[in-house]
């Protein structure tokens, strides 16, 4: 079954709470202060079963101007709205402000309800009806049905239920199969259970035992118990009013305005890119003006950066970047409201384009074009642009979040885009990583050039060190993605991978006849020299070799296991080194030994033995203890 949330809106004391009670039998005024003053201060909630059996959740919002923040916390989760106007007063200031908010948030399904019709004459009611129609002209409620009721006598209540039923039937349900998003509007503690949060489930399904997180606090938790309208349930679906008992979190750590989410779904941010409309009649908005920001149940102070102008006038729209004073979570296409810093008045609203953008400089044509494309583009075009702008690629689930698409829709779009050659999908640890095909091909061209140059310059080496290649071209790429990229090119037959090196497919070290003879002569020289090997400089002189050429030959012999590099000056033949280790091991069997004793045992000199012992210390074969050494390895 699909669940729809219906909310009230309208001026204080216009009968919203009484209307909800007439529809549902539930008095949503729950605070003592509300009972005494006769006005709603906090949000009220009640379930409603319609004639068709369809389930609605009714949200009763405060009408008093001082409680507009509570109203904003409730209106964000509405699928339908009832704009309530009292027949004895007509359209009032908060009627107009609530209507402006509904219009800015684009809550397109709604009903206009004129209440208290038992208090007025027919001709007066006709005037109020006309006044209301004039007020909603040009807004999302311009063509909304109008129902006249009396909660006291019950007149019109049955018709209102039928109208709600008809509207609910054509209202798209919220996505129950997606990721969980529940903006929190209440936090409290229940003895024996602990922390409980409540809110309207915007998307997804929560089941008892599900792992969740609270953002922007970054708290990990689990759904211990669930209630929907006071009934304990095993799962709650999008569109329902839910109370979630959270495991492992103190009540003081969670706040109204936070969001309960599928782990990794939304990222806290201090910046938001958006399109914003300033209301007609609002004072001009200057660059970096301070404002109150409202999205879902969250409220934050921030500043508006006008990206294409210095001042925004009433009725105008502009691309902006919001700089928040505390972290918030948002998704693309979320709608928000701004109120002026002082006096606090609703000045406009807009839509999120990028929930985690980089910092922008103003008056940058490429930034403005990019944001406009994202604002107007199809899901596929938006997804393609997001991937294009992420030069190092991004995880497909992150792409879904940034594009405000379901995981299922994102996967289908990516597969279609990959088949069309727009995107390359890389398998990374049983997941998908999306890279623009243009970028993927540019990477391969850069790697090809680098390896061709390396093989030409160092024909004796098996390949370029993996980490060196990464530092040159892929330093910003996560290690797991870089590894997957190399493995993909290896599977495609483009590269050959060794433990620490990478080479072009088919490459093998090549030698000239002269080099082959030099390699044999070098091996012989080090084998014969045994425990008194020549220095690097001596070898270069005796073979008349350039130092860089000699270094390449010696490195090759080291890689082949013929020689061992002791330090920058000395190389030892592996056989000679093994024999020396046995001599040292026998020497140490009688106790710690010094440099002179090792020198005598090897029949060599300090010039050769000291570097040898320092090397053996490095490889953990020996350990120095004062002026002596002991053997600690095999």
Curated annotation (Swiss-Prot):
Pfam families named in the record: Beta-barrel_SelB (PF25461), GTP_EFTU (PF00009), GTP_EFTU_D2 (PF03144), SelB-wing_1 (PF09105), SelB-wing_2 (PF09106), SelB-wing_3 (PF09107)
Picking any one GO molecular function of the record gives:
RNA binding
Positions of GTP binding: 10-17, 60-64, 115-118
Q: Which residues form the tr-type G domain?
A: 1-173
G4, as annotated region: 115-118
Where do the record's region annotations for G1 lie? 10-17
**Where are the residues of the annotated region G5?**
150-152
Q: Which CDD domains match?
A: SelB (cd04171), SelB_II (cd03696), selB_III (cd15491)
- What GO biological process terms does the UniProt entry carry, in alphabetical order? selenocysteine incorporation
- Which keywords describe this protein according to UniProt? Cytoplasm, GTP-binding, Nucleotide-binding, Protein biosynthesis
Task: Identify one Gene Ontology CC term for this UniProt entry.
Answer: cytosol
Please give the residue ranges the record annotates as the region G2: 38-42
Q: Where is this region: G3?
A: 60-63
Role noted for this protein: Translation factor necessary for the incorporation of selenocysteine into proteins. It probably replaces EF-Tu for the insertion of selenocysteine directed by the UGA codon. SelB binds GTP and GDP.
The cross-references to PANTHER family, in alphabetical order and at most eight, read: ELONGATION FACTOR TU, MITOCHONDRIAL (PTHR43721:SF22), ELONGATION FACTOR TU-RELATED (PTHR43721)
Q: Which family does it belong to?
A: Belongs to the TRAFAC class translation factor GTPase superfamily. Classic translation factor GTPase family. SelB subfamily.
What is the protein named?
Selenocysteine-specific elongation factor
Where is the organism placed in the taxonomic lineage, from the top? Bacteria, Bacillati, Bacillota, Clostridia, Moorellales
């Amino acid at each position: 079954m699909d669940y729809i949330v219906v909310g009230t809106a309208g001026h204080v004391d216009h009968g919203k709470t009484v209307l909800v009670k007439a529809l549902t039998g539930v008095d949503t005024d729950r605070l003592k202060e509300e009972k005494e003053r006769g006005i709603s201060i906090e949000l009220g909630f009640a379930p409603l079963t319609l004639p068709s059996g369809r389930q609605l959740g009714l949200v009763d919002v405060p009408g008093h101007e001082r409680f507009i923040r509570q109203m904003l916390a409730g209106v964000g989760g509405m699928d339908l709205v009832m704009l309530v106007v009292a027949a004895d007063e007509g359209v009032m200031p908060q009627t107009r402000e609530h209507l402006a908010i509904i219009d800015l948030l684009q809550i397109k399904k709604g009903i206009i309800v004129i209440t208290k019709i038992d208090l007025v004459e027919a001709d007066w009611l006709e005037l109020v009806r006309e006044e209301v129609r004039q007020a909603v002209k040009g807004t999302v409620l311009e063509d909304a049905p109008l129902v006249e009721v009396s909660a006291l006598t019950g007149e019109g209540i049955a018709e209102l239920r039928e109208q709600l039923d008809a509207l609910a039937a054509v209202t798209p349900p919220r996505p129950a199969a997606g990721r969980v998003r529940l903006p929190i509007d209440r936090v409290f503690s229940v003895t024996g259970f602990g922390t409980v949060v409540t809110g309207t489930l915007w998307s997804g399904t929560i089941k008892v035992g599900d792992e969740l997180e609270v953002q922007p606090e970054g708290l990990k938790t689990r759904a211990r118990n669930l209630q929907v309208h006071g009934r304990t349930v095993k799962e709650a679906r999008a569109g329902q009013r839910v109370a979630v008992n959270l495991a492992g979190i103190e009540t003081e750590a969670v706040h109204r305005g936070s969001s309960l989410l599928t782990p990794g779904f939304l990222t806290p941010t201090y910046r938001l890119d958006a399109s914003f409309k300033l209301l007609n009649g609002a004072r001009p908005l200057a660059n970096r003006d301070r404002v109150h920001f409202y999205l879902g149940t969250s409220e934050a102070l921030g500043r508006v950066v006008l990206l294409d102008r210095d001042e925004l006038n009433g009725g105008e729209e502009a691309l902006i970047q919001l700089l928040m004073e505390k972290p918030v979570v948002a998704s693309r296409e979320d709608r928000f409201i701004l109120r002026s810093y002082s006096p606090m008045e609703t000045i406009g609203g807009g839509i999120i384009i990028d929930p985690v953008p980089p910092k922008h400089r103003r008056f940058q044509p490429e930034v403005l074009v990019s944001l406009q494309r994202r604002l107007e583009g199809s899901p596929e075009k938006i997804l393609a642009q997001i991937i294009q702008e992420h030069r190092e690629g991004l995880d497909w689930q992150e792409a879904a979040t940034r594009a405000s698409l379901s995981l299922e829709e994102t996967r289908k779009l990516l597969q279609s885009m990959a088949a069309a050659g727009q995107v390359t999908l890389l398998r990374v640890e049983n997941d998908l990583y999306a890279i623009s095909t243009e970028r993927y091909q540019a990477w391969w061209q850069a790697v090809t050039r680098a390896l061709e140059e390396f093989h030409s310059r160092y024909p004796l080496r098996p390949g370029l060190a993996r980490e060196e290649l990464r530092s040159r071209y892929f330093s910003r790429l996560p290690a797991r993605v870089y590894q997957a990229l190399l493995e993909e090119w290896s599977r495609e037959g483009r590269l050959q991978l060794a433990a620490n090196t990478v080479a072009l497919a088919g490459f093998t070290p090549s030698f000239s006849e002269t080099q082959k003879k030099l390699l044999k002569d070098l091996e012989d020289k080090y084998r014969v020299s045994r425990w008194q090997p020549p220095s690097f400089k001596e070898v270069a002189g005796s073979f008349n070799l350039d130092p860089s050429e000699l270094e390449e030959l010696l490195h090759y012999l080291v890689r082949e296991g013929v020689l061992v590099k002791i330090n920058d000056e000395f190389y030892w033949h592996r056989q000679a080194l093994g024999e020396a280790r046995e001599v040292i091991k026998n020497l140490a069997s009688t106790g710690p030994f010094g440099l002179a004793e090792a020198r005598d045992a090897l029949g060599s000199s300090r010039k050769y033995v000291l570097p040898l012992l320092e090397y053996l210390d490095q490889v953990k074969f020996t350990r120095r203890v004062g002026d002596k050494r002991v053997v600690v390895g095999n």
